[in-house]
Amino acid sequence: MSNFVFYDFETSSSNKQWGQIIEIGAILADDELNELDRFESKCRLSPGIIPEAMSLIVSNTTPKRLKETNLSHYQMVRQFVEKLKSWRKVTYIGWNNLDFDQLFLRNTLFQNLEYPFTSTTNGNKEGDSINLARAANLYYPGTLKNRTNKKGNLEYKLDTMAPLNGIEHAAHTAMGDCLATLEIAKIIKKKAPSVWEASLLTANKDESLKTIKNEKLFCTNEFYYGKVVSFVQTFVCQHPVYQWPKTFDLKQDPNIYMNMPIEVLKGELKKSPKVLRTCRHNKHPIIMNPSYIDNFEEYKMIGITKLTERANIVRKNKKFAEKVELILRDEAEEKAETKSQEDLYEEETIYNFPPTEDNKILPGFHEAAWDKKLAYLQKFKDKRLQYFGKKLLYQEKPDLLSKEDYDEIHGTIVKRVLTTNDEKKWNTIPRTYAEIDTLREKFGKSEETEKLKMLEEINVYVEELEKFYSHA
């Protein structure tokens, strides 16, 4: 069994491409979830990054801390990368990390001239504890204690779940959230062991796909509008463009759809409830065997015998799968034709992969002395890597840049942070002022004096940034 890395980030923004990690917490644990090692670090805010006020308030990160921390962002990232390398092949786990922390990590590594997909390649895997927690309570009710919201649904917020489950929790600190996630995993492993074991089979997308294809029928759950919804499904085909497994919901009678003309089928597949579902194999689906159908009333009424018959009908009908593939391909092509053709910024191009030769020489940039790094950048064929390298020099050793390079980078930053165009994707000074005004009114009404005090500190900090960039 492999070890696990539980990790969490606090960030300057909710934007994974334009924000910055400002605090890292990570714990290495063995297969029994005993702690073996840990990494904890904070850093300064990099030039050109304008923080979102609410992000700082949630993580209780003061402007003073952002300005005076010894480590730069690049230095913190380098230390974290070296620690991860020393931990070797592991399964990464966070809390809602597949929709947040993982994406932040990938973009951070990409923009710091590191291979971005380290958590899911070279023998590494990645799962998500929030998926585990929802599945554990679905298959083994009461595994975890949750607060119920006004709509009567269970909440899966780490800061409320931890104390309810007897976990001491320094909420919204990277290490505090890390420790809480680890403790929740221990509860699941103990009280819902079959869910825990099943989750280990789908933390790798290739293994997940294999399970989906090989199981005649299986149970999964999805999260919609605050509710965990269960399904019993069987594999139909992979999406011909996006490669996601498409599955048939077995509460529907497949005989209705198997021999439909393709144009009729196309219309039927758009109706709700969906006959055809997407089982995102790269998002750590928790896949359970059909013995659990008694947990789901709709499927229990149909019965395992009938569900198995339906699965056999779907899986044997190759023409149905071919028609579905044609429909999906047409839809994808239509979508591509209407997709915006606007140019992407370098920061938004993580999935445009650099040449293999460039990936091989990435480590040399970090190994080179600072006064050698600029020359080293010329080895990269990919202009984006040269751009990111110059940005790192601007942030760390601006005096080593030529006046032309410095003026170009600094001028771009000034335009970005001062723009009043609210459609821009990065955070700006005017946008943060507007956010502060909104929060000031909100916290004033709720009489949250500590948050109001911190808000004023953030406002002063943003004024300092505005003064600096306005006189650049």
Q: Where are the regions that the model predicts?
A:
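Acidic catalytic cores of enzymes that act on phosphate-bearing nucleotides/polynucleotides
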Residues: 201-280
